[in-house]
């Protein structure tokens, strides 16, 4: 017997990708989607950073940018949910259309540009979830980024940690989206050192006796020398973990020409091999000392 997704997939794929995403969020918020059958087994539990993950499968940032459906996402069986990317001030992101998909190659290209309702709205949504009587088990991550026209990135990241850090189980510093001008420049050694020092200091000031772990989300398009430099910098700074990877600017030959011509970051199946390779590289470069969350092409 076909499942719910099998029945509605043709309708979903007839809609514009971003519209389909928004309709999915509304359905989750309203409880229209049927509950998923989930299995909790101690064999799947992962203990890390003093946190207990019910299982190692999480929902990556980008799905729930404004922390609207954290509860429903946990009820789908995820061991952790990473909400965001959130920016301090509200911003619309880039003009639509800005999300494109190619079902045959299981690929998506986006140039969203951090659309966000801002940290005040995000905090309000988080409070509603955290205050709920029936909060499901799981680990809550918050992915933070800078506003498009911010010339001093550390100010945005520290403001976000100040407001949202005490509410997070872990925080992800997003410096790898290809759709915000200048963001990937923060992966260079000196800007990265400066930023990490600022966020580490703000965490110490704002997050009390049990500060959330800080993770850095990186791009898959880094050259070998860049990877070595970043690994060294992250270890020096005392960051708690790495997320690999964000979307890629590469365009494999397998992609249709008109689809490949769209600007933005590529995700989906074509990213899998590249993302997996850079995970292995950073594991070696850090000597296995830092936990790595793998994302991209799953």
Regions of interest found by a model, annotated:
Residues 39, 89-98, 119-121, 179-212, ...:
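Active-site-adjacent beta->alpha loops and helix N-cap segments on the catalytic face
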Residues 52-58, 135-144, 204-222, 284-294:
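Short beta-strand/loop segments at the ligand-binding rim of alpha/beta enzyme cores
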Residues 146-158, 185, 191, 215-236:
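Active-site glycine- and acidic-residue-rich loops that bind
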Residues 3-46, 110-115:
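An N-cap/entry alpha-helix motif that binds or orients negatively charged groups
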């Amino acid at each position: 017997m076909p499942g719910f997704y099998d029945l509605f997939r043709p309708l979903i794929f007839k809609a514009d990708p971003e519209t389909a995403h928004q309709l999915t969020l509304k359905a989750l918020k309203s409880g229209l989607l049927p509950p998923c059958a989930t299995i909790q087994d101690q064999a799947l539990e992962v203990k890390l950073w003093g946190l207990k993950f019910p299982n190692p499968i999480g929902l990556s940032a980008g799905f729930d940018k404004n922390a609207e459906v954290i509860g429903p996402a946990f009820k789908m069986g995820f061991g952790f949910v990473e909400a965001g990317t959130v920016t301090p001030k509200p911003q619309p992101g880039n003009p639509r259309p800005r999300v494109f998909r190619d079902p045959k190659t299981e690929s998506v290209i986006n140039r969203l540009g951090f659309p966000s309702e801002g940290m005040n709205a995000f905090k309000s949504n988080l409070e509603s979830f955290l205050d709920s009587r029936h909060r499901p088990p799981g680990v809550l991550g918050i992915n933070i980024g800078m506003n498009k026209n911010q010339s001093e990135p550390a100010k945005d990241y520290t403001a976000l940690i100040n407001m949202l850090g005490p509410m997070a189980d872990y925080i992800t510093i997003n410096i790898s989206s290809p759709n915000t001008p200048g963001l990937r420049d923060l992966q260079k050694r000196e800007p990265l050192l400066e930023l990490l020092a600022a966020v580490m200091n703000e965490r110490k000031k704002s997050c009390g006796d049990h500060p959330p772990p800080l993770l850095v989300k990186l791009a898959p398009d880094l050259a070998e020398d860049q990877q070595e430099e970043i690994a060294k910098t992250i270890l020096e700074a005392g960051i708690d973990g790495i997320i690999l990877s964000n979307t890629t600017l590469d365009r494999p030959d397998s992609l249709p020409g008109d689809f490949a011509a769209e600007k933005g970051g590529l995700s989906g199946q074509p990213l899998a091999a590249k993302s997996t390779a850079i995970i292995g590289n950073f594991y070696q470069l850090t000597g296995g000392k830092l936990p790595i969350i793998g994302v991209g092409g799953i």
